[in-house]
Amino acid sequence: MGLSDQEWQQVLTIWGKVESDLPGHGHEVLMRLFRDHPETLDRFERFKGLKTPDQMKASEDLKKHGVTVLTQLGKILKQKGNHESELKPLAQTHATKHKIPVKYLEFISEVIIKVIAEKHSADFGADSQAAMKKALELFRNDMASKYKEFGFQG
């Protein structure tokens, strides 16, 4: 299920636009994740008090965590599938400490694509979206494999 060189180029080109505003993109991704999938908020102890969109919008901690999430994902995407060294510690913390189900990784992947499509519609057409979906699916599948290595069925 690897990506072609052209698909990786599409992924990294649009990711460059995401990186131009990590706080804006990251904050929007997490707000949308919690709005569209409220059950995911239960996995974030420090954000459980954020009940309304206004509270989420005003949260600097949520914005900072959004930057962390997208920064780490960017490091993984830039490895073009050769992401073992970046992925392993992330999978370990998500499996053993945070206990984030793979389903939640699917949710955030969907949200990431929606947010990019809204913010960069002219640059994120069907081909780029398909490439990003493949890249995020590769990431999720590899996370799921690592989860099993750490004894988490996620």
Curated annotation (Swiss-Prot):
Matching Gene3D superfamilies: 6.10.140.2100, 6.10.140.2110
GO biological process, one term: removal of superoxide radicals
Entry binding sites for nitrite: H65
Positions bound to heme b: H94
One GO MF term attached to the UniProt entry: heme binding
Keywords, alphabetical: Cytoplasm, Heme, Iron, Metal-binding, Muscle protein, Oxidoreductase, Oxygen transport, Transport
Binding site for O2: H65
Catalyzed chemical reaction(s): Fe(III)-heme b-[protein] + nitric oxide + H2O = Fe(II)-heme b-[protein] + nitrite + 2 H(+); H2O2 + AH2 = A + 2 H2O
Enzyme Commission numbers on file: 1.7.-.-, 1.11.1.-
Cytoplasm among keywords: yes
InterPro entries given in the database record: Globin, Globin-like_sf, Myoglobin
Domain Globin stretches: 2-148
Predominant location category: cytoplasm
Disulfide bond entries: none
Localisation per UniProt entry: Cytoplasm, Sarcoplasm
Pfam families the record matches: Globin
Entry's Gene Ontology cellular component terms: extracellular exosome; sarcoplasm
Protein's UniProt keywords contain Glycoprotein: no
Subunit record text: Monomeric.
Family, similarity comment: Belongs to the globin family.
Function according to Swiss-Prot or TrEMBL: Monomeric heme protein which primary function is to store oxygen and facilitate its diffusion within muscle tissues. Reversibly binds oxygen through a pentacoordinated heme iron and enables its timely and efficient release as needed during periods of heightened demand. Depending on the oxidative conditions of tissues and cells, and in addition to its ability to bind oxygen, it also has a nitrite reductase activity whereby it regulates the production of bioactive nitric oxide.
UniProt name for this protein: Myoglobin
Organism annotation: Phalacrocorax capillatus (Japanese cormorant)
Lineage: Eukaryota, Metazoa, Chordata, Craniata, Vertebrata
